[in-house]
Structures are given as C-alpha cells and as structure tokens.
Amino acid sequence: MAYPTLEKLFHVDRTSDRYENLQHLLQQRISSESTFRTGIYLDSGELFLAIPRELSVLHERVLRRERRVSALWKGLPTIALGAYIRSLILDEVVYSNEIEGVRSTRRDIEIALERARRDTSSLPGAAGKAHAPFAEFAQLYLNLTDNPQQPQSLQDIREIYDSVVRDALDKRDRLGEALFRTGQVVIANKQGRVLHTGVSPESKIEALLTQWIALSQSDSIPETYSALLCHFLFGYIHPFYDSNGRTGRYLLALQLSRPLSQPTVLSLSRTIAENKNVYYKAFDVTERPLNHAEGTHFVLTMLGLIGDAQESLISDLEEKQSSLDELEVAVKQCSNELSRRACDVLYFAAQMDIFNAFRETRLDDVAVWLGVSKPTSRKAFGELGAHDLIIKTSQRPPVFELTPKGRNLLGLM
C-alpha cells in the first residue's frame, strides 16, 4: 500500500474513536526519529516531513538520474552548452508564465533579453526608460548560472518579486510602500469553491517568511527536502496579490540549483505545466485540515515531477548527443570542398541548429568564438552561402541559419 495521507486513514476508520486514532497516527509520524520537523506552525499544525520508504526510493532515483544528466552535460561542446542552457531558460520562463495563464513565447523572452542587454537602464534598481516585459524575470534565470546568493532578508524576497513582475503587472495589483500585501486574498475555482486563503495580516506574512528563510538555510535537513517544503510554504503564505506562483517557482529553482544540476532545475516548469492538476492538488492535499500540515505528500509529488523532468531531459540530451556525433563526421567530410574556417563556421552553425531555440547563428558570436575580426567571419559565411549551405535571415544584427541543403548535408533533416 502506498504511503497514505492522514486524511485517508481517517476516512477508512469506521470506529467511533477515529478522531483519537487520527491524533495517535499524527503523533507517530511527527515524533518518529526520521521525521524532519520545521517548527513552523500553519493553521492545521506544524509543517513536517516524514520519511517513508517511498520517499527515500524516489529521492535516490532523482540523485541517480542526476549522475546521468551530469555525464551527458559534460560531454557537450561549449557552443552547445551555451545554446542549450539559454533554450532551457527561455522554456522555463514561458512555461512558468503559462502555469499562471500569462501568455509569452520564446521569441518574446529572447527579444526582452536582447533589449535589456543593450539598455543598461533595464538592470535591477537602475533608473531609466521602461523595458520589455519579462526581461528581468528571464534575467533572474540567466543569473542562476552564476550561483546567486539565496534570499537573506525579507527585502531580498521583495526585490526578487519586483524583478518577476516589473513591467508585466497591472498597476492595480502593484504593491505600495509595504514589502508585502496588506489586504486579504482568497483563491477560488470557477465554481466559487475557496481553494486557499492567503496568510494575513502583513505581520504574520513577515513572521512566516522569516521562518521560510531560516528553513531555506537550514543544514539539518537535506537541501532537496527543504527546497520543496519551502516551495509549499511560499505558496501557502501567498505574500503578494499577484505572481506568487512565478516568484515561488523561481525561488524553487534557486534553491534546487544547490543539490541538483542546472539542466534539471531549468526543465521543471515545463513538467509542472504539463501536470498542473497534479501540482496544484499537492498544495491542496497538504493544506487539508485532517492532514495536519504534513508535507510528505507534497514532497513525494514534487520528487515525482522532478523525476519526470529528468527523464525528458535525459532523452533529449541523448538524442542531441547522437546528432552531434554524426555531425562531427559530416563536417569532416566537407573539408575537401570548404576552407578550414568555413568548416569551423559550419560546425558552429550546425550546433546552433541542434541546440539553439531558434536554430540561429550570429556573426558576432562566431567571430568571438573563432577569435577573428567580423570581416574575416563574414568571409567564411560568404563561402558557405556560395555553396547554398547557409542563408542570412537578419541584417542587423547579422543572423544566419542552415539551408535545407546544409541541414541535409549534415544529416540534420
């Protein structure tokens, strides 16, 4: 029998003592030597995590898959790594938005990032003209590659939230001088049933978020477990009027980037978007009064979603690695007809075709990679164009992609 919720055990108990029996079961779970108690009290009790066999097995499988992900990741060339991580980041932002019903596309996010890169006034805290929506949100995920510091204060959490919603939030939902919302929020479904009532007043929000920070930094609980419990707790607190989900999922990615690989972390929102009902039910089950704030089933569900994300990632990496192996052979066979530099550019463009979100190759990037001037790079692109292997798709900046002939020659059709 799978590890049952306390609520389920209560309902199968037909005796007149079922309330007393439920309290006995609760005490058994919460007082077990293997249980992690948080000391954080919610409306239905102290948030805690029991460690049943199922959870240990799921966690071990996640760690085992991480070894496979890391091995595949380390086998990729630098060009492919950079292109793939950016593609994952674009997807992560798009799918995190989608979960909340906010429409965006990969191209929207890419354009926002490019505008932000060109306009230094779009950096967090800088004054200046407005910039494209989602620029700072996407930049948060890009910065994960630099191992940013975890939130140390309530102000840090607010600043992360501001980056998530800047220029993408209705003015009516923006906060004033207070760090967090001062009014009440109630989440209901289409039928009007209340699904969740956010914590209030603001003083209680601040108190629970202070405990959230302590839990996120605790060295007395495995980091994966604390990250997942913190994800539930942030959703439970619901500290803002809007965009709590996107802020919470970024914070989850930030925390999981310590025990797990970046590719895994950046694949999670897509899996959540594909399993939204499972994801939201995990919150609902944990909040039910008869479950007395046990976080075990939430962690079990999230570990399952992480596992699904890993499986999809591994499959995609293996497929791309196979294409890369065939590509290297194909490029070598072109050396009789093309100059060495043209072959290098072709190899770069082919990697972008496999790993880049838009299959695009920028002349500026190639020049930097080759360590040559832009005119020298342009000459190599011209040689490939003369053989109908590559075509220019943008003048400013100069952007190219493989032609059907080029893709067919390299076995990428």
Segment roles from a protein language model:
Residues 1-413:
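FIC/Doc superfamily catalytic core
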